[in-house]
């Protein structure tokens, strides 16, 4: 078992530059060398002292299993971080890491993503092409869901948010406990009369509208959608 007692929490940066817990499902800790991230799927009030949404443990476990599953199944993609180890008993996933996510680059005053990673848009487009070629959507696409590896390769974390085309419709009640108010409209617009979320529709809303308004502040993803999915 890997000892993470001296590993630091990772916090994303919000668009206003303030640090904030990166997600509701796992507690991210980074080793002193900043080369490995442990995603500990647990309810950790110390990491989220102000959080009002408490995700049920069974839902946390469900997403843990999906994260492991897709880290393995998509390991052939260059955007998938290397999976080092999985502690199934304690629900810990150890993956490749490199200091920070793109939220630090985007929302730290004086830093510029286009300058630091000139080809990030091309890499992002390549990522979406690979999702289409491999028949899945990834719906967690905030800046804190991406980092740049030591060799300059775009990597994406939070693979619990991978939806294979064959799982296009998922019953909303299964994941209701993770739906926050800021993004609830996407779920509302994508839920059919039988209570199933259409993730094809959800993905389109996310990539053409939500990301621009809520995080990235640009039209890059909407442009990529037009190029990749409407060819």
PLM feature segments, named:
Residues 1-20:
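Juxta-kinase regulatory segment immediately upstream of eukaryotic protein kinase catalytic domains
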Residues 132-148:
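Catalytic-loop of the protein kinase fold
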Residues 10-12, 21-70:
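ATP-binding glycine-rich loop module of kinase domains
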Residues 69-78:
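Structural motif at the C-terminus of the N-lobe alphaC helix and the adjacent alphaC-beta4 loop
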Residues 149-231:
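C-lobe/activation-segment region of protein kinase-like
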Residues 115-127:
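Conserved alphaE helix
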Residues 28, 95-97, 147-149:
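Conserved hydrophobic "DFG−1" position in protein kinase catalytic cores
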Residues 60, 79-118:
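Conserved structural core of kinase catalytic domains
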């Amino acid at each position: 078992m890997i000892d993470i007692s001296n590993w630091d929490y990772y916090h994303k940066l919000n668009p206003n530059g303030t640090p904030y817990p990166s997600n509701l499902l796992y507690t991210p800790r980074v080793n002193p060398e900043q080369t490995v991230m442990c995603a500990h799927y647990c309810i950790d009030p110390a990491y989220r002292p102000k959080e009002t949404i408490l995700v049920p443990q069974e839902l946390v476990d469900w997403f843990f299993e999906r994260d492991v599953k897709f880290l393995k199944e998509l390991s052939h993609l260059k955007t998938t971080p290397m999976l080092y180890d999985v502690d199934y008993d304690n629900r810990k996933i150890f993956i490749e890491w490199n200091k920070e996510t793109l939220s630090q680059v985007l929302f730290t005053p004086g830093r510029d993503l286009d300058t630091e990673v000139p080809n990030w848009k091309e890499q992002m487009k390549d990522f979406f092409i690979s999702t289409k070629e491999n028949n899945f959507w990834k719906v967690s696409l905030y800046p804190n869901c991406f980092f740049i590896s030591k060799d300059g390769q775009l990597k994406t974390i939070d693979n619990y948010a991978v939806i294979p085309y064959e799982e296009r419709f998922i019953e909303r009640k299964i994941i209701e406990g993770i739906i926050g108010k800021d993004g609830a409209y996407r779920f509302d617009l994508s839920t059919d009369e039988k209570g199933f979320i259409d993730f094809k529709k959800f993905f389109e809303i996310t990539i053409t509208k939500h990301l621009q308004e809520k995080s990235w502040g640009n039209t890059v993803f909407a442009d990529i959608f037009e190029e990749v999915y409407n060819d």
